[in-house]
A protein has these predicted regions:
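Conserved N-terminal beta1-alpha1 strand-loop-helix module at the mouth
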Residues: 1-87, 104-105, 153-156, 164-165, ...
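Short secondary-structure boundary segments
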Residues: 44, 70, 92-93, 113-115, ...
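Glycine-rich phosphate-binding active-site loops on the catalytic face of alpha/beta enzymes
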Residues: 88-98, 131-141, 173-195
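Catalytic cores of alpha/beta
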Residues: 73-84, 117-125, 149, 156, ...
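Conserved beta-strand positions in the central sheet of alpha/beta enzyme cores
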Residues: 41, 67, 90, 110, ...
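Histidine/lysine/aspartate-rich catalytic loop segments that bind and position anionic ligands
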Residues: 92-138
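Conserved functional loop/turn residues at catalytic and ligand-binding sites
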Residues: 36, 85, 93, 106, ...
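Short, charged, surface-exposed secondary-structure boundary motifs
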Residues: 76-77, 98-102, 119-126, 140-143, ...
């Protein structure tokens, strides 16, 4: 899991797939990966999410890491996701037992937080990365930059309203990485991959 976490930090972003047309989702995942997306998340509220995930896993190179999102019930979602090959699991909330179960399965747990208290609670539960959601309505780069010093040790993944145009504002404010969904285009992915590579060179 530490290796997955480090890969996420280096990548700077996770591409999120959500939709009602499984075939289109698979093609979008293939296209995003080809454009340089190193992480693909399939949300569990997507139609035939299991099929989409496994089709993509069979088509993508091993260096593209895959995970699931919108985990609402840990016990019913995580064992199956681990069997599919999920290496990380995101939730907009903090399902009971999510962190412990995911980590027992070798899956990086990323529970959600809409407030500073929830962020700290997720950290205390053992989460190595916490999803800030919804980022643009419950958080802002200024809020993230202004959190109390003890909370700065918490790795954060702002998601919800993040775009290629504002992702670096969040990273500059202290975000570990960001999640991008329907706003992410193939061109954005190519540009983001290059920009994240440049950032690693500058920040190294």
């Amino acid at each position: 899991m530490e290796w997955t976490l480090e890969r996420i930090k280096r990548a700077g972003f996770i591409a999120i797939l959500r939709g009602k047309d499984p075939t289109e989702l698979v093609q979008r995942g293939v296209d995003l990966a080809a454009a340089g997306a190193p992480f693909i998340e399939v949300t569990l509220d997507s139609t035939d999410a299991s099929w989409v995930f496994q089709m993509l896993r069979g088509q993508l190179d091993d260096d593209v890491l895959m995970g699931v999102g919108t985990v609402m019930h840990a016990e019913s979602a995580l064992p199956s996701a681990a069997e599919w090959g999920a290496q990380f699991a995101l939730s907009p909330v903090q399902p009971e037992g999510m962190v412990d179960l995911a980590h027992d399965l070798g899956v990086l747990a990323v529970p959600g937080a809409a407030t500073a208290n929830e962020l700290w609670d997720a950290h205390l539960s053992g989460a190595m990365l916490v999803k800030l959601y919804p980022a643009v309505t419950s958080w802002s780069p200024e809020m993230l930059a202004g959190i109390p010093d003890p909370m700065r040790q918490v790795n954060t993944l702002p998601t919800g309203g993040i775009t290629a145009d504002n992702v670096e504002q969040w990273l500059d404010a202290g975000a570990f990485a960001c999640g991008l969904g329907s706003s992410l285009t193939i061109q954005d992915t190519d540009l983001l991959s290059s920009r994240m590579l440049e950032r690693r060179g500058v920040l190294r």
